[in-house]
């Protein structure tokens, strides 16, 4: 009897955690909504992130609450002797939270740790181009998202570069955190967690068409608004068009209207207007 009671107690505890944790996060975010960031943190956001000034007062309050919750939940680790500062943590957290401003209290449930390198880092990539021969090569990366390890890796040098070049269509933080959103439904396939079945059907139809259009443009050496790296696979396409949406929104809307509208509906945000 005793083992059965213990098992039942454990199961009830797990059920209570699964049910209660999201509610606790909602409650915690509402509590933090009433607590603004320190003035010197607000000054950093205003100085480094153009979108901060464009937010409505309510959106700004919401962003600041999400930043505080994010910093409490996620662990930051400096790698290769990189020294983490409040500014580093704040700049990363703010962009991650801006991306998911309207996506609930826990948009990155699989993420535990953010590793920050001073500059681009090397990783060993194992591929099998023909399905049989395994090839290994060292590649240089500015960021990487790992699902199973609960880790995300960023290079501060690339982040600093991006901060000086808003609206160039490149943002490593948006890119890697879009991958995290992609994992929200348990699979990294270029389709994040959506609402209704119709949303999935529309998403897959438009994204498949736009992905093929990008491949065709590149094959014919035509100019593209979307970075060519998006043609790597559907996962990278979603991450790349997220960068494009937030940094080159007007161009995306003009050239890829349906794709723009799908992303606008998902993120529930208007992209940057003037930076």
Swiss-Prot record:
One of its GO terms (molecular function) is metallopeptidase activity. Belongs to the MtfA family. Pfam families: Peptidase_M90 (PF06167). The lineage of its organism: Bacteria, Bacillati, Cyanobacteriota, Cyanophyceae, Synechococcales. InterPro entries: MetalloPept_cat_dom_sf, MtfA_fam, MtfA_N. This is Uncharacterized protein slr2042. One of its GO terms (cellular component) is cytosol. It comes from the Bacteria.
């Amino acid at each position: 009897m005793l083992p059965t009671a213990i098992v039942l107690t454990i199961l009830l505890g797990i059920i209570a955690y699964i049910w209660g944790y999201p509610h606790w996060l909602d409650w915690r975010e509402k509590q933090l909504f009433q607590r603004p960031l320190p003035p010197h943190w607000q000054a950093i956001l205003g100085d480094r992130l153009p979108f901060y000034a464009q937010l409505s007062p309510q959106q700004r309050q919401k962003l600041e609450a999400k930043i505080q919750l994010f910093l409490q939940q996620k662990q930051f680790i400096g790698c290769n002797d990189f020294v983490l500062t409040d500014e580093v943590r704040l700049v990363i957290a703010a962009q991650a939270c801006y991306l998911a401003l309207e996506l609930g209290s826990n948009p990155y449930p699989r993420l535990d740790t953010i590793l920050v390198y001073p500059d681009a880092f090397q990783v060993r990539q194992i591929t099998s181009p023909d399905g049989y021969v395994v090839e290994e090569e060292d590649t240089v990366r500015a960021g990487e998202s790992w699902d199973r390890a609960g880790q995300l890796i960023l290079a501060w040098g690339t982040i600093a570069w991006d901060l000086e070049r808003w609206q160039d269509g490149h943002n490593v933080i948006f890119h890697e955190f879009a991958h995290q959103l992609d994992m929200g439904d348990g699979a990294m396939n270029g389709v994040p967690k959506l609402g209704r079945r119709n949303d999935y059907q529309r998403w897959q139809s438009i994204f498949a068409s736009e992905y093929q259009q990008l491949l065709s443009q590149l094959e014919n050496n035509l100019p593209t608004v979307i970075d060519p790296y998006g043609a790597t696979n559907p996962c990278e396409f979603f991450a790349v068009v997220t960068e494009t949406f937030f940094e080159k929104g007007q161009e995306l809307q003009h050239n890829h209207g349906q794709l723009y509208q799908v992303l606008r509906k998902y993120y529930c945000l208007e992209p940057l207007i003037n930076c």
